[in-house]
Every structure is written in structure tokens, then in C-alpha cells.
Design a protein with these regions (language model features):
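Short, internal acidic amphipathic alpha-helical interface segments
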Residues: 74-125
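Charge-rich, low-complexity N-terminal segments
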Residues: 1-68, 109
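Mixed-charge, glycine-accented linear interaction segment located at domain edges/termini
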Residues: 140, 144-161
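Secondary-structure transition/turn motif
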Residues: 50-55, 71-78, 127-131
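A short amphipathic beta-strand at an alpha->beta junction
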Residues: 12, 18-20, 98, 157-161
Length: 161
């Protein structure tokens, strides 16, 4: 008889539980540091700890050899003040084409610039891995990196004109 808690389209329940247990100390450390941190299942059906901050977002997951930390900053509404919908759409399309070229000079291999459709602005995503034994360093790392990622977003926006 099969386990009633098992759903083929979902990750193995045991794996999710293990990841949740492994990530719980990270969630607690982030909260103790003043972040709003919570556990959730991400878009790839992996357990992660999500952090929402005024400067950006962070997601912490179990990576290949440690904690995978994805940091993201987005500047919303780059062309929101553009009155003409046609002109706003044209500028958005041009920004999507220019972002990869413009970002080459600013970003490291573990960083990527995007056009965020939901927020209608430039975003930068940085993905790094931190060893399991350095889990207590994650809150300070997130606090240090989010402003720097926000600076990258601003530089890319400036280049887009």
C-alpha cells in the first residue's frame, strides 16, 4: 500500500522534512537578526527560507555542498512615468534587449541581471553557496550583500538611460 502523503508531482516528503529541519536554525538566526524570515516551498518544489526586506529578497535552500543563498533586488516601475503606453512598451522591450549587454561590465559570473515582468523594472540576482558549518553567518551576509546588489541595479538602470 502506498503512502497517502506521497504526491508524485511533489518532492519526497522525507526530503522536504529533512531540508526543513536543516534550514530551521537558519530561519531562527535570520529572525534573531531582525529579518522577516519564513519557510516555504519555492517554485522548484524545494523547501526554502524566504526573507523579505525593504532592499530585496533572499531565499536560502539546501545546495550541492552547503546552503544555497539567492539574493534579489528589483527596482520597480522603471518606465512607469511614461505617459504613452506604446512608448513605455517600446522602452521596456529595448531594456530587455540591452540588459545582458550592459550588465556584462558590472556583474560577476554568479550574478545575473533581468527584466522583472511583475515589477516592471531591472533586477539583479546573485546566487552563492555557503558551507553548512557557516550557517550562523548567513544573516550578516544577507544584510551586507543586499545593499550592494541594489547598487548594481542602480548602475544598470543608469546605463539604460
Amino acid at each position: 500500500m502506498s503512502d497517502p502523503g506521497f504526491h508524485p508531482e511533489s518532492p519526497e516528503p522525507d526530503s522536504l522534512r529533512e531540508d526543513q529541519q536543516t534550514l530551521e536554525p537558519v530561519r531562527q538566526a535570520l529572525r534573531a537578526y531582525g529579518f522577516w524570515a519564513y519557510g516555504t516551498i519555492d517554485e522548484s518544489n524545494r523547501w526554502s527560507i524566504a526573507v523579505d526586506d525593504e532592499l530585496g529578497r533572499a531565499d536560502v535552500r539546501i545546495g550541492q555542498d552547503g546552503y544555497e543563498i539567492e539574493l534579489r533586488a528589483v527596482s520597480p516601475g522603471l518606465y512607469a512615468e511614461e505617459d504613452s503606453p506604446w512608448r513605455r512598451q517600446a522602452r521596456t522591450r529595448l531594456a530587455r534587449m540591452q540588459i545582458p549587454r550592459v550588465s556584462r561590465g558590472y556583474l560577476q559570473p554568479h550574478q545575473v541581471a533581468i527584466w522583472d515582468e511583475e515589477m516592471e523594472g531591472v533586477g539583479v540576482i546573485e546566487t552563492v553557496e555557503m558551507p553548512f558549518q557557516r550557517g550562523e553567518d548567513i544573516p550578516a551576509f544577507v544584510r551586507q550583500r543586499l545593499p550592494r546588489i541594489e547598487e548594481l541595479v542602480t548602475m544598470i538602470e543608469r546605463e539604460l538611460g
